[in-house]
Amino acid sequence: MSLQSIKYSRGSLEILDQLLLPGQSKYVVVRGVEDGWKVINKMQVRGAPAIAIVGCLSLAVEINPEDFENKKSLRQEIEGKLNYLVSARPTAVNMKIAADELITLANELYKDEAIDVTQMKHRFLDATEAMLKKDIADNRAIGANGAQAILQGVAKAGKAPAGSTGSVRVLTHCNTGSLATAGYGTALGVVRQLAELGKLEHVYCTETRPYNQGARLTAYELVHEKFPATLVLDSMVAALLRAKNVAAVVVGADRVASNGDTANKIGTYQIAVVAKHHDVPFYVAAPLTSIDLAIPGGDHIIIEERPDREMTHVGEHRIAAPGINCWNPAFDVTPASLITGIITERGVFKPAELKEAITKLLES
C-alpha cells in the first residue's frame, strides 16, 4: 500500500510533515488558508500536484463551517484566498491553474440566480474535493502511459539488460510519488506501474541536494514499497548511466511551457544533458495541470530561490564555511530539445507536438 500524504474528510485536513521524514511520521492539522500557505511555503508539503490539492482543500476546510451573508461575500472570499495561496510557491503552476478553475466556478455560481449562498458553498466544496479523486486517477493513467512508452522504447532499441526478461532499470530525480501528489505519483507512478507489471529490474534515485527529497522521501517510498532500489549522489549520474545500462530517466515537473521546456527540481537539467550524451531516453511525467500553454518557453518561468541556510546547514549543523555566498534556485529549466517525451494522463507527447495536442484535448 502506498503512503498517504494527505488525509481529508469534509471539514478536516491533515498533511504528513515531509520535513520530518524519514525519521518521524507526523501529521500536521491544517485548519485553514493561513495554515495551508505555511505548510506549502515551508515545504512541509511539496510536489506541484500536492501543493494544489492541499492549497484548495485548506480553503475548503476554512469555509466549510462559515455562514456567508450572501453570494458576493463568498465569491470574494474564494477569489482572495485562492490568489493568496498561489503566492506560497509561485513556480508550481498546478496551484495557479486550480485557483483559476475554482475562481471561474465561483463566478459562474455567483451569477446563477437559481442557487442560493448555501448551495453555492456546497457546490464549491464538491468541486474542490473532486480534485483530490481526479489527481489519483490521473496519476494512475500517467503511470500506465509512461510504463508503456519506456517498455516500447526498450524493445525497439534492444536495451533491456541481459537475462532480464524485458525488465528495465530506470533513474528518477527528486520525489514524485505518493508524497508529492494525492496518491500513486507521477514519475514514481511510472516506476510503480513497471513494478506492478513485473518489469522493474531496478530503480535508482538521486539524493537531490540541497533539500534531499530523493534521499529522505523517494528512498523512503521505495523502501516502503519494497522495490529494488539504490540511492546515488547527484554527482554520480554520469557514471551511473555509463555503467549500469539504465533504460530511461523519468522525472516530474513543476511547470511545462507550451514548447516543452520544463521547470523541475534543481539538478534535472544536468541529468537531461548527461542522458542525451549517453543516448538514454529522458521522460517528463506530469498531469495536464502542470502544462502552462500561456508560457511560450522556459525563459518566461519564474524560478523560486530558497534561503541560503538550506545549503549551508543540515538540520542544526553547519556544513559550509561561515561567510560563503550561496545561490540556491529551487528549480532549473530543461530545454525541450533534451526531452524524449512528456507523459500525461492523456498520452505521451513529443515536445514539438505538445501545444497542438494539448489544445485539441482541452477543446474536446
Swiss-Prot record:
It catalyses: 5-(methylsulfanyl)-alpha-D-ribose 1-phosphate = 5-(methylsulfanyl)-D-ribulose 1-phosphate. The keyword Iron does not apply. Keywords: Amino-acid biosynthesis, Cytoplasm, Isomerase, Methionine biosynthesis, Nucleus. The active site is at D254 (proton donor). Pathway: Amino-acid biosynthesis; L-methionine biosynthesis via salvage pathway; L-methionine from S-methyl-5-thio-alpha-D-ribose 1-phosphate: step 1/6. One of its GO terms (biological process) is L-methionine salvage from methylthioadenosine. The record marks C174 as: Transition state stabilizer. InterPro entries: IF-2B-related, IF-M1Pi, IF_2B-like_C, Initiation_fac_2B_a/b/d, M1Pi_N, NagB/RpiA_transferase-like. Catalyzes the interconversion of methylthioribose-1-phosphate (MTR-1-P) into methylthioribulose-1-phosphate (MTRu-1-P). This is Methylthioribose-1-phosphate isomerase. It comes from Drosophila melanogaster (Fruit fly).
